């Protein structure tokens, strides 16, 4: 479609490996292809890529841009020098670049991806067991709990997802993030709150940190909040 209209295609690559895993496991014709081969096919269609390395780069900092056309790269080079650092490092320390190179390799290992994504699926199965609503199907990096369906007694003006995030933290010290009216921010012209259709609590699962016992703990804490949801009437 982009080629038809002469539009260059940019791929946000933050979770490229997780997406490749889902292509392999869910799309017909890809079951026997390796993750790296699927990634090659994805990027064969792209003109540019952006990469936040803190996601599928499995590092704590950094990122990069990729270009198919060297002329496009040259146009951006001066901005790297002005705002980030020289072209060979772009403001990143050598240690971080080495870690990123290794992280990109490891992120495309099928066993690593399956372990990570199945841990998220395990948490989803526990929420199913407790009847806690969330966005289905579960994704690769997080569970998005449906705060609007849980905190029905909290007015939307008092931020249901943020309220659920606070209740979960008070219950068990678990930090999630609100994806709702606070994130949407106020209308720049009217200064009124903007209320999106969904009010979600995102529980993003760090890589190579937690066991399924921790997922049990998260689910049990959410159940405790869910069981007393009728008593939560304000944000």
Where are these regions (language model features)?
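Conserved PLP-enzyme active-site core in the AAT-like
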Residues: 1-132, 155
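Active-site loop ensemble at the mouth of alpha/beta enzyme cores that anchors a bound cofactor
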Residues: 148-175, 189-196
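Short, glycine-/Ser/Thr-/acidic-enriched flexible segments
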Residues: 55-56, 69-72, 105-107, 140-141, ...
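Conserved glycine-rich beta-strand-loop-beta hairpin in the small C-terminal domain of fold type I
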Residues: 119-121, 135-147
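PLP-dependent enzyme catalytic core of the Aspartate aminotransferase-like
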Residues: 107, 171, 183-235
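Structural preference for beta-strand elements that scaffold enzyme active sites
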Residues: 8-10, 48, 142, 176, ...
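Short, conserved charged micro-motifs
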Residues: 73-74, 152-160, 208-217
């Amino acid at each position: 479609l982009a080629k038809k209209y002469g539009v260059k295609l940019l791929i946000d690559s933050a979770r490229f490996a997780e997406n490749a895993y889902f292509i392999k496991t869910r799309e017909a014709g890809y079951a026997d292809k390796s993750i790296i081969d699927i990634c090659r096919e994805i990027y064969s269609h792209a003109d540019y890529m952006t990469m936040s390395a803190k996601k599928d780069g499995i590092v704590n900092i950094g990122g990069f841009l990729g270009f198919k056309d060297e002329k496009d790269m040259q146009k951006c080079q001066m901005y790297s020098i002005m705002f980030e650092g020289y072209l060979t490092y772009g403001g990143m320390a050598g240690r971080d670049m080495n870690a990123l190179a290794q992280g990109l390799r490891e992120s495309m290992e099928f066993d690593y991806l399956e372990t990570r994504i199945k841990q998220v699926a395990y948490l989803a199965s526990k929420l199913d067991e407790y009847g806690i609503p969330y966005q289905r199907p579960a994704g690769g990096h997080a569970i998005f709990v449906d705060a609007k369906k849980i905190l029905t007694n909290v007015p939307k003006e008092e931020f249901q997802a943020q309220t659920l995030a606070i209740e979960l933290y008070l219950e068990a010290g678990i930090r999630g993030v609100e994806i709702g009216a606070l994130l949407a921010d106020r209308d720049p012209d009217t200064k009124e709150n903007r209320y999106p259709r969904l009010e979600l609590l995102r529980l993003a699962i760090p890589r190579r940190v937690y066991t399924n016992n921790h997922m049990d703990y998260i689910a049990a804490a959410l159940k405790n909040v869910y069981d007393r949801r009728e008593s939560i009437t304000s944000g």
